[in-house]
Regions:
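Active-site beta->alpha N-cap acidic-glycine motif
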Residues: 16-111
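Well-ordered, non-membrane alpha-helical segments in soluble/globular domains
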Residues: 51-66, 95-109, 139-152, 240-249, ...
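Loop/turn elements at helix/coil->beta-strand transitions in domains of secreted/extracellular proteins
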Residues: 30-31, 71-78, 115-121, 159-164, ...
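Exposed beta-strand face motif in extracellular beta-rich ectodomains
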Residues: 2-6
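Active-site-adjacent pocket scaffolds in enzyme catalytic domains
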Residues: 56, 89-101, 160-161, 167-266
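C-terminal domain-boundary segment and adjacent tail
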Residues: 189-193, 264-308
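Conserved structural position at the C-terminal beta-strand
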Residues: 10-12
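Metal-dependent polysaccharide deacetylase catalytic core of the NodB/CE4 family, i.e.
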Residues: 76-174, 196-200, 266-270
Length: 308
């Protein structure tokens, strides 16, 4: 099967009915890996505070870690952004972090974001850290919140840094939200797709479909024209050793080993966060080193699902 998309049709001639299924061939996905991070906003405040003292945005320790992952192991890094850090968020930090939003972020590092956009991308995640904000949303609401994040990314990082892939907050979204994201230019969304869980992080997929995607790298919902990618390991959920074992299991799978996606959340990087992970650095570098040594190469999810 050489075509990017092949449509299979089964017809019951006696009943006059038919079923259709589309099969996608994704040669650019094979052997690729990506690391993404959700809930990002705090590093942008740090850049803003230090806009007159940092000579490079990679003087920010969080971004410096991802640059190390890229320079040593060729990682492609994707950061999903909140629009605002709110009063509610402050309770999870022991230091007095101020409220702020993306409209106040400096554009002093715009050219550096643009220059590094071949390996570092940004996208919309949610307006703020609220529970499942798009599970029962409207197209108008999510479009408005998405556009607010896009507007600021374009202002402080440039169009080169804006990705057409995201993970929505909590990976929960109704069909209206998915259609709105497709209309906003998004081509793919990542999730956990874990069957049998109250929160499977699977957007609006049925339990049957969740079980199907769980054993695969990608699924394309042809009704909404949206690809969904399976996240193979959430690096802040288990021990680093368990993460590596989980990644090794995915890599060895004939149906999941073609493309590996690992993900973490920004807040676990900071010592003042209530659930701070002192080994955050190892949780980022060890998986990407493992994948690189296994022969995988950094590849954005958008490149993995592209045609041609």
């Amino acid at each position: 099967m050489a075509a990017y998309r092949t449509e299979l049709i089964a017809r019951d001639l006696s009943a006059g009915t038919e079923c259709r299924a589309s099969v996608f061939r994704l040669p650019h996905a094979v052997g690729g890996f990506r690391i993404s991070s959700d809930d990002n906003i705090l590093f942008l405040y740090d850049l803003t505070v230090h806009k007159d003292t940092y000579r490079s945005m990679f003087e920010n320790p969080y971004l410096a870690l991802y640059r190390e992952a890229h320079e040593k192991y060729g990682a492609k890094v994707h950061l999903n952004l909140f629009y605002e850090f709110t009063e509610n968020d402050r309770q999870y930090f022991s230091t007095d972090r101020p409220c702020f939003d993306l409209s106040t972020v400096t554009d002093a590092f715009k050219e550096e974001f643009r220059a590094n956009a071949d390996w570092l991308k940004l996208s919309f995640h949610s307006r703020a850290n609220t529970m499942r904000p798009y599970e029962n949303t409207t197209e108008e609401e999510i479009t408005r919140e998405c556009e607010a994040v896009h507007r600021e990314i374009l202002r402080f990082a440039g169009k080169e840094a804006l990705s057409d892939v995201t993970t929505l907050h909590f990976g929960a979204a109704n069909e209206a939200a998915v259609r709105a994201m497709r209309a906003a230019g998004y081509r793919a969304m990542a999730g956990y797709f874990i069957p049998g869980r109250p929160n499977p992080v699977a957007y609006h997929a049925s339990e049957e479909l969740i079980a199907h995607i769980y054993e695969r790298d990608f699924f394309c919902d042809t009704d909404t024209d949206m690809f969904f990618g399976r996240i193979d390991s959430v690096l802040n959920c288990n021990t680093n050793e368990d993460n590596l074992a989980e990644i090794a299991e995915a890599a060895a799978s004939p149906t999941r080993g073609g493309y590996i996606e690992v993900m973490i959340h920004e807040q676990y990087f900071y010592p003042d966060y209530v659930n701070y992970l002192p080994d955050f650095r190892a949780r980022v570098l060890d998986p990407v080193r493992y994948l690189y040594e296994k022969g995988y190469r950094g590849r954005f999810l958008s490149d993995a699902v592209r045609e041609g």
